[in-house]
Swiss-Prot record:
Residues 1-79, 100-130, 219-244 are annotated as: Disordered. It comes from Homo sapiens (Human). This is Uncharacterized protein C6orf141. Coiled coil: none annotated. Signal peptide: none annotated. The lineage of its organism: Eukaryota, Metazoa, Chordata, Craniata, Vertebrata. Residues 1-10, 100-127 have a biased composition (Basic and acidic residues).
Amino acid sequence: MNDPFARMETRGPQGAANPMDSSRSLGDLGPFPREVGRGAPLAPGARNPATAGASRSQGGGHEDRTADRALGPRAGEELDRESWVREKVLFLLHPERWLGTRGDPAREEVAGAEDLPHAGGEDHGEEPNYPSVFQRQKRISGRRVAPPRDAADPPKYVLVRVEDYQVTQEVLQTSWAKGRMTTRTEEHFVTALTFRSSREGQPGERWGPAESRALQARTGASRVHAAGRRVSPSPGTWLEEIKL
């Protein structure tokens, strides 16, 4: 009677669960509820919104790539070259703007917060002189734009000469592993930019090579506003007319 193994043997068959009975009892409870967060089944002709969004995003990227391919690399190179010429001339004419020198009110902007609100009540209308937490700072804006020119002054132009050429040089290279000296050729592409101020001219006129040489002999340029391509006297060399 007190044998634990006997109690286990007598209670085991009664307490054991029949797998057929458990499945039958689960079947009586009905079907399981649908998982939370999963929507209703899609109709036979309906599209899955997740796949539709993915295809739409892929289609937009394809259209962007097609538009970039239509522009071509040449258009991007032209824009980069013209902007580079414009920025270079600005630096040569007004280095103080690029170096951050103060003194030009048209180029400086005030950045920072104003003084904090003053507390009142005991000063009888007088505002206490509290120091500002955020000190005012002056900075030079990133975009270099010439100050507005007086309408009475006639427009002036400066002629910029841009020349692309290739430099080839031989470099002696020593190979320590094999104990011999070899020659290696290096090629460098150089862009030379020179500019001279020109006489007062009319915008849109074309100059010949003789006139361009005469214009390059003058000096005294001031501000730069815009650039436009004019004459290409030789391959790899062109002239940029800069409006002052």
